[in-house]
């Protein structure tokens, strides 16, 4: 028996492949679009998550580069890690590309980079992006509230 497939586009242009089992009945086979949960799972699989205590130890050693990927409005509300670079998630690719005039000279592909955000999700996504751009030593310390609660140094 030959297997037939149909492709259907939804109103949101999501492409779904259906396997025909009967001319009247179609079963979804797989979707080509990812959702936020899938992006986060992929990011968390390649960007190690460290505890606030481990992040504080790295901060104290002085050998790591801390980057807050939240926007300035969020940083103004809760502060950030003392000495952290402030590179919003939406601008990271431009700031991390050595070939662009927007490159942030504070970044180095050999640096031990520790990312922070509001809860950990943006930092994970940012870390995956940095790894794909050639930055190898990247980790996610999670959210700023955990950092502050653990006694980490912060600034406005």
What are these regions (language model features)?
Residues 13, 20-22:
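Polybasic, lysine-rich low-complexity intrinsically disordered segments
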Residues 67:
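Active-site flanking residues adjacent to catalytic metal/cofactor-binding acidic residues
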Residues 19, 28-64, 72-112, 119-156:
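Rhodanese-like catalytic fold shared by cysteine-dependent sulfurtransferases
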Residues 4, 23-26:
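Leucine-biased recognition of intrinsically disordered, low-complexity hydrophobic segments
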């Amino acid at each position: 028996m030959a297997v037939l497939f149909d492709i259907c586009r939804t109103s949101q242009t999501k492409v779904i492949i259906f396997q025909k089992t009967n001319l009247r009945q179609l079963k979804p086979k797989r979707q080509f679009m990812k959702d936020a949960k899938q992006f986060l799972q992929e990011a968390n699989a390649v960007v190690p998550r460290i505890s606030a205590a481990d992040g504080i130890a790295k901060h104290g050693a002085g050998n790591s580069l801390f980057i807050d990927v939240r926007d300035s409005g969020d940083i103004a509300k809760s502060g950030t890690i003392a000495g952290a670079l402030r590179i919003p998630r939406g601008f990271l690719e431009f700031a991390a590309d050595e070939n662009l005039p927007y490159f942030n000279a504070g970044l180095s592909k050999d640096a031990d980079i520790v990312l922070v955000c509001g809860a950990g999700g943006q930092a994970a996504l940012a870390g995956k992006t940095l790894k794909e751009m050639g930055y190898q030593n990247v980790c996610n310390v999670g959210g700023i509230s955990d950092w502050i609660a653990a006694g980490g140094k912060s600034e406005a």
